[in-house]
UniProtKB/Swiss-Prot annotation:
GO terms for molecular function: integrin binding. It comes from Mus musculus (Mouse). This is Intercellular adhesion molecule 5. Its main location: membrane. The modification Phosphothreonine is found at T182.
Amino acid sequence: MPGPSPGLRRALLGLWAALGLGILGISAVALEPFWADLQPRVALVERGGSLWLNCSTNCPRPERGGLETSLRRNGTQRGLRWLARQLVDIREPETQPVCFFRCARRTLQARGLIRTFQRPDRVELVPLPSWQPVGENFTLSCRVPGAGPRASLTLTLLRGGQELIRRSFVGEPPRARGAMLTARVLARREDHRVNFSCLAELDLRPHGLGLFANSSAPRQLRTFAMPPHSPSLIAPRVLEVDSERPVTCTLDGLFPAPEAGVYLSLGDQRLNPNVTLDGDSLVATATATASAEQEGTKQLMCVVTLGGESRETQENLTVYSFPTPLLTLSEPEAPEGKMVTISCWAGARALVTLEGIPAAVPGQPAELQLNVTKNDDKRGFFCDAALDVDGETLRKNQSSELRVLYAPRLDDLDCPRSWTWPEGPEQTLHCEARGNPEPSVHCARPEGGAVLALGLLGPVTRALAGTYRCTAVNGQGQAVKDVTLTVEYAPALDSVGCPEHITWLEGTEASLSCVAHGVPPPSVSCVRSGKEEVMEGPLRVAREHAGTYRCEAINARGSAAKNVAVTVEYGPSFEELGCPSNWTWVEGSGKLFSCEVDGKPEPRVECVGSEGASEGIVLPLVSSNSGPRNSMTPGNLSPGIYLCNATNRHGSTVKTVVVSAESPPQMDESSCPSHQTWLEGAEATALACSARGRPSPRVHCSREGAARLERLQVSREDAGTYRCVATNAHGTDSRTVTVGVEYRPVVAELAASPPSVRPGGNFTLTCRAEAWPPAQISWRAPPGALNLGLSSNNSTLSVAGAMGSHGGEYECAATNAHGRHARRITVRVAGPWLWVAVGGAAGGAALLAAGAGLAFYVQSTACKKGEYNVQEAESSGEAVCLNGAGGTPGAEGGAETPGTAESPADGEVFAIQLTSS
């Protein structure tokens, strides 16, 4: 019979579980008391916010339930044992909602607490005074209306970023809202234009909320300091009408001085001051002026204001009128003998004095009458006026000049008859005439031409010298006078009167004379350099008269000196020292023939070949004054006989010159090869080096480093680098020669490793040969030896897996162009007899088969001719002749040296040669 289905099983289990839980619930109801619960029990909500309250009970079947509160509700949700309600627009600082249920004729209650908080959205700092005196206290007051709870609120007063005072309101009632903080602060200078503010912080972090902070708008404080004393006023006591005088008002101890105001006035007239600051000091400067309507005593006032306070100073100032004296002449320009009246007046209250004579009373004019003469011309008249103002005597004066008209006069004092001036310095020519109007003076040469620039500063030149007629003219007449101008100047020696260069001809008659210009006329003398004798009169010219003469001219204005070079010319002449009769030219030196000729002017020299290979050829010369014909270059000069001809404008001369050619040593590859080879044992000879050159060079060769020992025969030690030097009278040449010594081969070493070999073992034969040029290595192995290997240069023979057939005699031969040498070595392969017998039987069969094929190949013509070379004989089946030739032992190397092993008598030795790739 099948069991119950799984679904039925689950249903039964659920039923049992429900019954069990019901029984347990009934038991719990019977055992536990009933209660009501309100969540959240305590809540903190922002003012105007909302909150959900959850009211629940453990009563299994409550009769009814609810939530009592004075707050506004927005929505309700219910269950059997719970109630949820949303409270909105919560504004009361504190309220206590009550959750209740009716259960088993009992009322279950739970009471909650809801408190509100308000952020410090409004932080107000009471306005500050517009100006606050430094050193006095002012009030800082901060209000935060509505923010709370107050117990969580903190207020801070700030000066800029500096904290002045901080206050928290811990312990205030929970329902308390809003706060205020007031402080008295001492005003300082550094507080000027500093911002003050208030910071409010509502800290609800202990209640699970954040920190809410806000600041007031900053308020700027302006502080000031005003001194107790009044400004200092500097001003004149009196001021003339239409004149300007400075007025200065100063006050110290101001702060901030740039914000102070200044008011300056004269009577009802406001002045415009220019204010300058220096720290806490203020200086106001203005210009005071007054009109005629302000004449009298006026009040000058200065007022300085700052921060609503002011300081004031007043001074009295008297405005007066005092015109400049009026000085008049009845005729400012009067002819000689005319009567002129002079008068002076200076206003109604001034007392005037004319030429020291005062007027009778103040306000009246002073007068003077004069019959003028020429002595009154340019006479000045002076009038002085005095006025008393406010106890102070003020003065003004005026002057005027009288001009008297008369005809010109030229006297010797103002226009001398004769002038003598030195040349050069600037002078002013004065020829003045007396007269009024002022005469114009004109000085010119009587015959016309040059005119003197009178009254102007200018240089004195010789062209100004001469006689001039000066005429003075004005409206009253004219005057005439002749004057003479003399210009003196130091001597001058020019090229016309005293040339710098004079040429004389040897044997003629000449004299040295120099003419100098100057005023007064100078004296001239000429002296030869280094001597004291003065040259005077004619003389017979000789070469020793050539040289430099010093000519000096002297007068009262100075002296002048000049060097005169005297050249004595003569015909050409040869001297052996300057132009040798025999000259040797060295090839390649680039040196030219020097043929110096005595003569003036310098002769032109030309040397031309007269016979042989040099006939008609021009010899190149050192002198730049050579002939015009084409000459040889220094590299192809031809020896021979040359005729040298020297010519100048005074004659010519001829000289014979014999030219010979020589050359320095020269070596090259053809005469002295740089690489030479000797054969060891040959007769020792010198290096094959020679050199070209005249005279014939001597060649000497020496070894570099260690010296070469003198031997009869060439040795290997003679190899090395040699330096060959060729020398003659004109120099040296050298070459470096490398000498190589070649020698026949010698097998210096033939060794086996290991010395004895067991069957199946490995062994190696090493062959080392000494030879130059390097030797070719070849091997001869025992017949039947297979599986042989050779190194790349055949110097090593190796066997892997040795057998009895590998035992026997091996020969190593070294061969080069100078001979052949061979050595032999015997290899033994030892082992047990049983191994030998078995191996021998097997090996014998193999050897018989291999031997037949090998014999056929070894006897072949190709092997005899040595035409094959293999890598591995055993693997490839190819074979070569190990002696490399396949002929008789002496076919390439000649007879073997004593002590070496000999080849078989029949001359046919064949073996297998193995070479590696």
